[in-house]
Amino acid sequence: MAGHTENEIVIAAPLDLVWDMTNDVENWPRLFSEYASAEILEREGDRVRFRLTMHPDDEGRVWSWVSERVADRASLTVRAHRVETGPFQFMDIQWVYEQTPEGVLMRWI
C-alpha cells in the first residue's frame, strides 16, 4: 500500500546553520532522538549512503536500514531514498529548505 506524508517546520535560525546541521548525517543521533547511530557507508560529492539504527522499540526490536541522500545546495533541496529494507516498505523523500522572515521553513515531501 502506497502512502504519502508531508511535514513542515519553521526553525528560527540562519539558513546556513539549518542546512549544515540537517545534512550532517553523522550527527543525526544528537539531532534526532529516535536514532541510536548513523554510520556513513559511502560518500561521493553531494551523495552520501548511510545506515541508520533506531533505539529499541517497546518490544525490544532494533530497526536498521540503509538510505542514500543527494544534497543540492543551489536549489536548497535534498533527495533521499531507502536502499535496504527497514521498518517500512518504501521511502522516497524530498527535503525542501526555504528562507522566510521567521526563519527557515523545512518541508519533507
From Swiss-Prot:
<protein>
    <recommendedName>
        <fullName>Putative polyketide cyclase</fullName>
    </recommendedName>
</protein>
<dbReference type="InterPro" id="IPR005031">
    <property type="entry name" value="COQ10_START"/>
</dbReference>
<dbReference type="Pfam" id="PF03364">
    <property type="entry name" value="Polyketide_cyc"/>
</dbReference>
<comment type="function">
    <text>Involved in developmentally regulated synthesis of a compound biosynthetically related to polyketide antibiotics which is essential for spore color in Streptomyces halstedii.</text>
</comment>
<comment type="similarity">
    <text>To polyketide cyclases.</text>
</comment>
<dbReference type="InterPro" id="IPR023393">
    <property type="entry name" value="START-like_dom_sf"/>
</dbReference>
